[in-house]
Design a protein with these regions (language model features):
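Active-site beta->alpha N-cap acidic-glycine motif
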Residues: 31, 42-44, 48-61, 65-128
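Short loop/turn segments at strand-loop or loop-helix junctions that form parts
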Residues: 36-40
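N-terminal Lys/Arg-rich, disordered targeting/topogenic segments
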Residues: 1-7
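Hydrophobic membrane-insertion alpha-helices, especially the h-region
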Residues: 10-26
Length: 128
């Protein structure tokens, strides 16, 4: 009669250890995702891997907002990492490579709508 109770306690203890280990490891090894965009344009058949439509970009930002992810700037991420601050596992960073006009024309209004910061890396050859 005592064997089932002991077995039950062992199983519950093992489950608790696994859950605690998962929580610890998730927090210990968590990395902040950096969402990197190039172009936010309606048609991009020649480079589909670096383009996203305005509608798709809107849906992605809506997902981030709806599921309460915290969007921080790249500068905030660097500061937090250098100060060894713990960030929420729902923290993300948004960046744009090249700083093309479509980033401003189509991406910026959506970012502004949600109040999301973003870092834009400009191509220096295009400046001035």
């Amino acid at each position: 009669m005592k064997e089932p109770k002991i077995l039950k306690k062992i199983i519950l203890f093992a489950f608790a250890v696994i859950v605690l280990a998962f929580i610890f490891l998730r927090n210990f090894f968590y990395e902040v995702p950096i969402l990197k965009y190039h172009h936010v344009i309606a048609y991009c058949s020649d480079k589909p891997l670096i383009c996203v439509s305005p509608k798709s970009f809107q849906k992605q930002m809506d997902f981030i907002s709806r599921y309460r992810y915290k969007v921080i700037s790249l500068e905030e991420l660097v500061g937090a990492l250098s100060q060894k601050k713990k960030l929420s596992y729902k923290t993300v960073v948004i960046t744009f490579d090249d700083g093309t006009e479509d980033n401003y024309q189509y991406g910026f209004p959506t970012l502004k709508k949600y109040g999301f910061p973003a870092t834009i890396f400009l191509i220096s050859d295009n400046i001035g």
